[in-house]
Amino acid sequence: VDFSILRDYQSIKLNRNIKAGKIAVADLNGDGIYDYIIRTPEKNVDPGMPGTLDGSTYQIEAYLSDGTFLWSKDLGQGIEPGVWYSPFIAYDFNGDGKAEIALKTAPETTQRNEKGRVDSGEEYLSVWDGMTGKEIARVDWPERNDRYGNLVRQNRNQIGMAYLDGKTPYILACRGTYKLMTVDAWQLKDNKLERAWRWDGDEENPVVRSMGSHNMVCGDVDEDGKDEILLGSCMLDETGLYYGLPD
């Protein structure tokens, strides 16, 4: 008896003999079937833990639904191997029927300090072509500053997607959870990232701090056809307007 026909999962062979960490699914080639974007290895260093001194890095790999290997890219020393340092998401952001990958990146020249940490240097929001891994667009990630607190609090990064106008997928780049919180909303248009708005919790009256969580949830809460953004105990509407618990 061939029991393989009874399984409710897909099995593919990875390009390297290494365990996968996080996986995103999206249609990379436009055939209507989900493909796989995999971040390896499964290692995870939290900002509150000691840094890694072994020089290990994350790689992003892409596979078609049938297991065909497409490409692999190393994120380099500028991205520490931890989920807070390396958020990524896959979606069709430009409406061409094929998904792109949006993620946090850093220059190849960035180096870690003697504690295995990255405490300075540029950081980017990059968009890669799903079939080739080639970078399509790049802008600055929300920058570090002392208002976030120490490095443990500065290095809390998340990424998401929301239909802010009800029809266009916007990329959301978020920094901060336990003190200052900021969010940038970007649209991929003509192979360029255009910023729609930035929300900065310190610009609210009173200021909004330490209200985040370990995820960012987007959805149409008020049923106006446009997505809102839920960050822990606070919510942003499609224009970046803040709503708190009393609202």
What are the residue ranges of the model-derived segments?
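Beta-propeller-forming repeat regions
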Residues: V1-D247
